[in-house]
Curated annotation (Swiss-Prot):
It comes from Chlamydia trachomatis. Residues 127-305 form the Tyr recombinase domain. Changing Y244H: In plasmid pCHL1 and plasmid pCTT1. pGP7-D is required for growth within mammalian cells. Belongs to the 'phage' integrase family. The keyword Calcium does not apply. One of its GO terms (molecular function) is DNA binding. Keywords: DNA integration, DNA recombination, DNA-binding, Plasmid, Viral genome integration, Virus entry into host cell. This is Virulence plasmid integrase pGP7-D.
Amino acid sequence: MGSMAFHKSRLFLTFGDASEIWLSTLSHLTRKNYASGINFLVSLEILDLSETLIKAISLDHSESLFKIKSLDVFNGKVVSEASKQARAACYISFTKFLYRLTKGYIKPAIPLKDFGNTTFFKIRDKIKTESISKQEWTVFFEALRIVNYRDYLIGKLIVQGIRKLDEILSLRTDDLFFASNQISFRIKKRQNKETKILITFPISLMEELQKYTCGRNGRVFVSKIGIPVTTSQVAHNFRLAEFYSAMKIKITPRVLRASALIHLKQIGLKDEEIMRISCLSSRQSVCSYCSGEEVSPLVQTPPIL
């Protein structure tokens, strides 16, 4: 079968088939969010998962985006602008995938830029995630250490390395370099690409990790029966520590990371240094907390927090 005929034959896939293929190429969190987005588009009757992709050739993308952005109430609930933009992003990303899948037979959606009808625009300058002070997270960690030593180490790595929870839970013992007090993290980039970043940690924290792993191989953070730790297990122990330490806000891995970022800004670290440590993509991303090409492994040494 010729190449052109092969790509044209993909038009006989259903939207449901194509969406499953697309979602399988995404990272866990993105897949979860976009799966919800696809269901939303189906509920709005923008997509019919039983239809073949032939219908996509005649789809009016502008009308679809307008329908998403014009929605004020869905299932009895007010739809926020952030939610509308997230659903629009899902639709655009999906059509771009269909464009690649069919080698151009299906045209991708393009964000609207008409005055008063723009698909994407800045909603807020600040990240809504709450934060705590260094003194507060110190108290929280004291409680967490008693509740669960493993999750105490996870929390310390989040704060000290400015890392996301999934980056920590995916660590393997061969990512730990005790001789140099460094840890190699795999950072997910766009289009499922990965890069690595080497971060130097305080000797005391690395010694605690060495005692915890005790020479075993495989995943660093495991349960009592040796299986990888889940985010729900960490969340449960965080809630207990939050209660015992009498925190005024809900403490999540996201809150800890945001708190560490804000603290670095407060102690005078430059935006460029914070970007290198945290892997944030822009100064705007850094500032929002406070007022694609793969490269060689990066080495960062954040200040001791």
